[in-house]
Amino acid sequence: MVASVGRRSKQAAPQMNGGFFMLKGISPIISPELLKIIAEMGHGDELVLADANFPGTSIGQKCVRCDGHGCAEVMRALLTLFPLDDFVEAPLAVMQVPAGMFPGDKAPIWEAFRAAADTDLPTAKFDMMAHDAFMERAKKAFAVVQTGETALYGNIIIRKGVVRA
């Protein structure tokens, strides 16, 4: 006869935003797969945070899905775990919008990107890239995070900085 030693009650695991989490201090938006990807990244590596229309799987060397969350929301969560690169003038890059599409030729979502960047590096500047140049840079990125973002021109490339002790 075998005794049942160390059995735990069949209590449900804690939930947040509909998903299970087993680590403290890490947003449940960050999946285990995404956590592994950002842990593997080094200084200067880039990550594409892509909207729902972006061809993430065909463009990216690696593509991880983050459906149900917007790009700025994912960006805020990521920037609690790694810094933006402060060794370059513009550690952020967005795709230029066609002239006249938005007031001031700025996609409204860029304000949310700015607010997210300000949580880590308020002096961070954005590169404004032509569509084709952005796509070529995205192909070289460490990975693409495909979000559920529905805002037009809701893509951003973020460059990882150095974690200082």
Which role fits each region the language model picked out?
Residues 18-67:
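Long, hydrophobic N-terminal alpha-helical segment
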Residues 66, 75-112:
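Glycine-rich nucleotide/cofactor/substrate-binding loop typically near the N-terminus or early
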Residues 3-21:
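Short, Lys/Arg-enriched N-terminal segments with co-localized hydrophobic residues
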Residues 45, 49-53, 60-77, 81, ...:
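Conserved mixed alpha/beta catalytic, RNA-binding, or beta-rich assembly cores of soluble enzyme
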Residues 22, 26, 66-70, 101-105, ...:
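Catalytic cores of large soluble enzymes that bind and process phosphate-bearing ligands
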Residues 101-165:
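Glycine-rich, aromatic-bearing surface loops/beta-hairpins
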Residues 45-48, 62-63, 85-94, 124-126, ...:
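Structural motif
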